[in-house]
Amino acid sequence: GWILKPFQHLVSNFGIPNYAEVDPTVLFSLSYILMFGMMFGDIGHGIVIATGSLLLAKKYRSFSIVGFLLGLSSVSFGFVYGSLFGYENIIQPLWMSPMHDPTLVLLVALGWGALFLIISNLLAIRNYLTVGLKQQAFYSGKGIAGLLFYLAALFAAYQLMVNKQFGLLEIIYLLAPLSFIMRFQWKQSTAGLFERILVVFIETLELIISTVSSTLSFLRVAAFSLNHIALAAAVFSIASMMDMTGHWVTVVLGNIFIIVLEGAIVAIQCLRLEYYEGFSRFFSGKGKAFKPLKLDI
C-alpha cells in the first residue's frame, strides 16, 4: 500500500528479497517506527516532526509519510515518558520516565532487542525451510538450535542477574543446543582435522560473542532516550543564565537543534539496527526487482 511504499525504498537500499525470502517491509516499517519513538520520545518534538512532514507532503510525498509516522511515534512515547519539548515536569508519564526510571528504560530496551532478534531468527528458519535446507533450519546458528541457544542464554542471564544463581541446569540448557550447532559445523566443514577443529571453535566463539553483542546493541535505544533528556537539560541550563528574552531564544533554538540533529542521528541509528541486527540474520537481499515485459508495437 501507499503507507508501506516509502519504507520499501529503505528496504531496497539493503537489497531485494528473493523468491523464497519473506519480504521484511511490514516488519521493518513497524519496528522502525516503534524504535524511533522509543529513542526520541517527546510530545512537542513529535508534533513538530509530524507537522513539518505534512507541510512537505506535496513536494516530498515518500519522505512526508515516513516523517509523519515517526512524529506520531515520538508523540506517543512522549506521553509514555512524560516529556514535552524537553520539559519532564509538565505532564505525568504514563509508564516510565528516562529521567526518573533509567534502569527500567534500559531493561525495556534489552527486552525489545531480545524480541526483535527472536523474530529475526524465526524468519531465518522459515526461509531455510522454504528452500528445503532442513539441516540449516534445525541445526545452524540461525536455525532452531541457534534460537534455543539464544533462549537458554536469556534464561541463564535472568537467573544470574535476578535470582543470583547459575548452576548445572543453566549449563545444560546452554550446552545442549550448542552441541548440535557444533556438530552441524563439523559436518559442514571439508577441511583437515586440525583446520576443522579450528573452524568449529572460531564459529562457535563468534556465535556466542554475537549473541551477547547483538542484544547489547539495543541498549542504544535506551541510551538515546537518555541522551535526549541530557541535551534538553543542557539547553535549559544555558537558558537559565540569561535574561527573559535570551532564555526563550535559547530554548527555541536548542529545541530546533535537538529536533534536527538528534532526530537525524536517531533515524540513522534505527536504520543501523534494522540492517545489521535484523536483516543480516534472515535477509540476503540478492533478489531481483520485478520488471514487467514491455512490447513495442
Model regions: which residues?
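Conserved, carboxylate-rich catalytic/transport cores that coordinate ions
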Residues: 1-297
